[in-house]
């Protein structure tokens, strides 16, 4: 597996040749919910303007790009790993599993896969890790948007079920508001029990 850092424009173009799937993840850090990944194969004949790392985009822009990606991309797939799988495997291995599921779910088999970050799982096709790839490679940027919007919407649904936890605001991340909600209301089935704040609450309240 090659890991690319500080790509030149020529390297960036070279990596995007052929039928390439971009892959990114969202949700490694939260205390609750699935880790969500997406795989996207873009159509070179239908360019999408404004793609970037999803964290650098406004929610309104992400939502608009989500619709455009779903409309124009050749293939889009979402893969995930559950809190139970995260607890059993650890977050790194669960993320790799979710990425494999995303690529396996594509309706078109890619010739290669480009993953944001510094490592990739085995996809059965050539794969390369691209550091900060979500800001460099259009297909990874698109995957970043799909994964982010998907997970944020799921946190909104969880917020509707458990409004006292404030998931729509903190998205499950370990914020002061989330810690206070756990202290006041306890741990949910959707919480990741292997993550220290959740584990410590369970140990203190067992």
UniProtKB/Swiss-Prot annotation:
Enzyme Commission number(s): 3.1.26.4
Record: residues binding a divalent metal cation: 24-25, 116
Compartments (UniProt record): Cytoplasm
Main location as per UniProt: cytoplasm
The keyword Cytoplasm is assigned to this record: yes
Catalytic activity: Endonucleolytic cleavage to 5'-phosphomonoester
Cofactor note: Manganese or magnesium. Binds 1 divalent metal ion per monomer in the absence of substrate. May bind a second metal ion after substrate binding.
Cellular component aspect of the GO annotation: cytoplasm; ribonuclease H2 complex
Transmembrane regions: none
Keywords: Cytoplasm, Endonuclease, Hydrolase, Manganese, Metal-binding, Nuclease
Cofactor(s) needed by this chain: Mn(2+); Mg(2+)
Gene Ontology annotations of biological process type: DNA replication, removal of RNA primer; mismatch repair
Domain RNase H type-2 per the UniProt entry, residue ranges: 18-206
SUPFAM superfamilies: Ribonuclease H-like
Keyword flag Manganese: yes
Coiled coil: none
Family: Belongs to the RNase HII family.
Functional note: Endonuclease that specifically degrades the RNA of RNA-DNA hybrids.
Name recorded for this polypeptide: Ribonuclease HII
Organism field: Shewanella amazonensis (strain ATCC BAA-1098 / SB2B)
């Amino acid at each position: 597996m090659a890991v690319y850092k500080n790509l030149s424009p020529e390297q960036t173009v070279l990596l995007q040749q052929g039928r390439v799937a971009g892959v990114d993840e969202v949700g490694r850090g939260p205390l609750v919910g699935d880790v969500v990944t997406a795989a996207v194969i873009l159509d070179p004949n239908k360019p999408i303007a404004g793609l970037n790392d999803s964290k650098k985009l406004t929610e309104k822009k992400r939502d608009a790009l989500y619709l455009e990606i779903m409309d124009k991309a050749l293939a889009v797939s979402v893969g995930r790993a559950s809190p139970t799988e995260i607890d059993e495997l650890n977050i790194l291995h669960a993320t790799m599993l979710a990425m494999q599921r995303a690529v396996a779910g594509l309706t078109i088999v890619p010739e290669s896969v480009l993953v944001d970050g510094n490592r990739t799982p085995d996809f059965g096709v050539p794969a390369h890790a691209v550091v900060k790839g979500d800001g460099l490679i259009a297909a990874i940027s698109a995957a970043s948007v799909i994964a982010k919007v998907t997970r944020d919407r799921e946190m909104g649904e969880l917020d509707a079920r458990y409004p006292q936890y404030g998931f729509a605001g903190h998205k499950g991340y370990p914020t002061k508001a989330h810690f206070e909600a756990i202290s006041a209301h306890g741990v949910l089935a959707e919480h990741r029990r292997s993550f220290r704040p959740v584990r410590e609450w369970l140990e203190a309240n067992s």
